[in-house]
């Protein structure tokens, strides 16, 4: 017969744990992982320390080099609601001849000591009617099969809102491609047609671009399409003599 003062092993025992000697298992594991993460982070930072001597532009379009603009065309396009329209058809022979003949003019200063580092397709969109309140949409694909014929009009599917200044900009340089492109004068002097296919389209994409609006009505858009070539400029040669003429 057990009394309130006698020992009963079935009642169990009560322990008071001192937090000085016992810790939560979850906090122990989290602290260990946190220390391991900090050690790995320090090792990664040490490997990246030599790169702090270099400066890069967040936006390659605004980086070092000269932006040489080649305007392809300015046109007014009528866009229906809930649809997007194809911007440019690269396969048109007249379009190619007119565009690249302008590219080879003297007004486009590319010489042997300059390199094309990148090419941007820039589309500037403006409404033609006053007091219109809508935003421009755009959608593009960089690559497709050579035999693919894009549709003139498509329905809006996952578009992107065009940002500041109603300007849509796409970098056409292929990842791991042949940039920089050099010695352009000698290339296109030999064969004009081969230069377009072998030099330009070999290193840069021919994108498919559609534009539209989020308006519920039919809208007129003034499109200005241009190629902007990012040209690397080299420092001029140092003079051989230091005299009054220099």
From Swiss-Prot:
Chain ranges passing through the membrane: none
InterPro entries reported for this sequence: Polyhedrin
Pfam family, one: Polyhedrin
Top-level lineage group: Viruses
Keyword DNA damage: no
Entry annotated with the keyword Nucleotidyltransferase: no
Disulfide bonds: none
Molecular-function GO terms, alphabetical: structural molecule activity
Keyword line: Viral occlusion body
GO cellular-component term (any): viral occlusion body
Homology family: Belongs to the polyhedrin family.
Biological function: Major component of the virus occlusion bodies, which are large proteinaceous structures (polyhedra), that protect the virus from the outside environment for extended periods until they are ingested by insect larvae.
Name of the protein: Polyhedrin
Gene name linked to the record: PH
């Amino acid at each position: 017969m057990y009394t309130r003062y006698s020992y009963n092993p079935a009642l169990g025992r009560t322990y008071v744990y001192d937090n000085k000697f016992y810790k939560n298992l979850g906090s122990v594991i989290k602290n260990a992982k946190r220390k391991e993460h900090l050690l790995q982070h320090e090792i990664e930072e040490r490997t990246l320390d030599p790169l702090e001597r270099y400066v890069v532009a967040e936006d390659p379009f605004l980086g070092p080099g000269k932006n040489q603009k080649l305007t392809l065309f300015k046109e007014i396009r009528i866009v229906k609601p809930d649809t997007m329209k194809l911007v440019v058809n690269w396969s048109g022979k007249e379009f190619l001849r007119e565009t690249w003949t302008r590219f080879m003019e003297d007004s486009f200063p590319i010489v042997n000591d300059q390199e094309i580092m990148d090419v941007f397709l820039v589309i500037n969109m403006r409404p033609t009617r006053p007091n219109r309140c809508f935003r421009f949409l755009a959608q593009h694909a960089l690559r497709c099969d050579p035999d693919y014929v894009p549709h003139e009009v498509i329905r809006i599917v996952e578009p992107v809102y065009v940002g500041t200044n109603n300007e849509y900009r796409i970098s056409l340089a292929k990842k791991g491609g042949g940039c920089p492109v050099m010695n352009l004068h000698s290339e296109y002097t030999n064969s004009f047609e081969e230069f377009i296919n072998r030099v330009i389209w070999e290193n840069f994409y021919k994108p498919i671009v559609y534009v539209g609006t989020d308006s519920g009505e039919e809208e007129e858009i003034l499109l200005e399409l241009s190629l902007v070539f990012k040209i690397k400029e080299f420092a001029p040669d140092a003079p051989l003599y230091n005299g009054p003429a220099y």
